Amino acid sequence: MRSMRALQNALSRAGSHGRRGGWGHPSRGPLLGRGVRYYLGEAAAQGRGTPHSHQPQHSDHDASHSGMLPRLGDLLFYTIAEGQERIPIHKFTTALKATGLQTSDPRLQDCMSKMQRMVQESSSGGLLDRELFQKCVSSNIVLLTQAFRKKFVIPDFEEFTGHVDRIFEDAKEPTGGKVAAYIPHLAKSNPDLWGVSLCTVDGQRHSVGHTKIPFCLQSCVKPLTYAISVSTLGTDYVHKFVGKEPSGLRYNKLSLNEEGIPHNPMVNAGAIVVSSLIKMDCNKAEKFDFVLQYLNKMAGNEFMGFSNATFQSEKETGDRNYAIGYYLKEKKCFPKGVDMMAALDLYFQLCSVEVTCESGSVMAATLANGGICPITGESVLSAEAVRNTLSLMHSCGMYDFSGQFAFHVGLPAKSAVSGAILLVVPNVMGMMCLSPPLDKLGNSQRGINFCQKLVSLFNFHNYDNLRHCARKLDPRREGGEVRNKTVVNLLFAAYSGDVSALRRFALSAMDMEQKDYDSRTALHVAAAEGHIEVVKFLIEACKVNPFVKDRWGNIPLDDAVQFNHLEVVKLLQDYHDSYLLSETQAEAAAETLSKENLESMV
């Protein structure tokens, strides 16, 4: 009988997936130290949770089925409400934006539409009580919980964006660069435009400056077109027609490598050849539409336009590119049967595709996220294509400044004569900068300055030492309050009656039953001090164990009795009864489950 009990216990432990310190019963606390913690831990293990998995994350059905939603929803509500009975919607959206998420995020569409509908249908005046709040957030609970637990790639997003804004202002000073004039339509660009947008791999967004003004991708489309080609055709096939090495020459030179193919996809000759590989069996319109659909997916279906004026201007004044096209044709660089003029037309069209800094930053973030769009969760590009693309951007993406940029900045990037710089911090974020004045090598002067200042402050350089680079900031590290989540903070919050701090600790998955050297818990301290609201939070929201004994053998109820806190005594006595009942029910359920598991094994 004893061996059977041991086997059942082992199965019960396996069923609770590696619980910590006997947290197998779903009714026992702490809230995020049991089933909820396991669920969130699993979500975090699968690519930092749901924000950028391979499928769009619009709803969290698994959490709903496992019965965890009400408790997670409650904790989110308590954290944002800070003791109030109802939450103004604007307070929720403000708190949401502080995490980096936008109300327009496609993943939150269901949540935001429910909130809007609730406001219209109810007479609450834009206030959500706990029940309404749960209904609104239930389909996005895991994403929202991760956001408020600061479990995104950049935990303290407000602090990080504050630094970015200061760098933006520092780089804003007049540069002395000149707007590109060899394409007549580009010569009309406003030299005062200056904008920067970023999007992390978790979908955190920030923009500063002129980030909603459309501009042509120009050469920034080259790495994107190459990535699409490799995703659809494979690396080996694409590199039969284009090389991988920096040329050491100007981007528009009539030059081939020793194998008789363009040096790389980032020079004009290479980009024209790559354009010729796309959908070779289709007509011009179908080819352009095919690439545009890919670009739209990379941008999370955000703004994408087309400048016909730029396209016509390119065609009328693109003598150098026509010369390159005929040179490639003469050297038989195109696949058999390719129409050289059609390839040039597609190249001109793709250079004339318009984005904004905001939509461009999502495209860059898709590259940073291994080909998966962070705001839709859709897998757009293969991991192989992204790896190859970033490698070539690192070595060849900045014209004749590529070596210097790799040395000083150490990140994959691509510049364009429109004044754009598409910058990728792999596994962290993508950025798009826009400032039309160019330096003598054809790169945005403000953009280069911004990138250099960014890497001088943060340890984003490819070869920065992440452990010992003390002089640089690492925004990926949890800081401040999160770094100091110790039993001292927990017990001090209980001692001082700081329910808001306790809510934050619980939401960040802290074990609310931690003990000090006297084996006293937060519930002991709150009961001894008579903090009724703290006791309520610990027993109602966190479901902590009220029978933990300190080194003198006292449970929290004993402390409340000793210090004559009668309200706390009554509250704890009632909780003892309900806790024992729920524990008995949970043990019975676990016993039944173990028997079923044994029977299925037999």
Swiss-Prot record:
InterPro entries for the chain: Ankyrin_rpt, Ankyrin_rpt-contain_sf, Beta-lactam/transpept-like, Glutaminase, Glutaminase_EF-hand
Official protein name in the record: Glutaminase liver isoform, mitochondrial
Stored PANTHER family: GLUTAMINASE, GLUTAMINASE LIVER ISOFORM, MITOCHONDRIAL
Example GO BP: glutamine metabolic process
Superkingdom field: Eukaryota
ANK repeats: 518-551, 552-585
Region of interest called Disordered, as start-end residue ranges on this chain: 1-29, 45-66
Record text on activity regulation: Enzyme activity is not stimulated by phosphate. Phosphate increases kcat, but decreases substrate affinity, resulting in unchanged enzyme activity.
GO cellular component: mitochondrion
Pfam family, one: Ank_2
Native species: Mus musculus (Mouse)
Keyword terms: Acetylation, ANK repeat, Hydrolase, Mitochondrion, Repeat, Transit peptide
Places the protein is found: Mitochondrion
Family as reported in the entry's similarity comment: Belongs to the glutaminase family.
Span of the transit peptide along the chain: 1-14
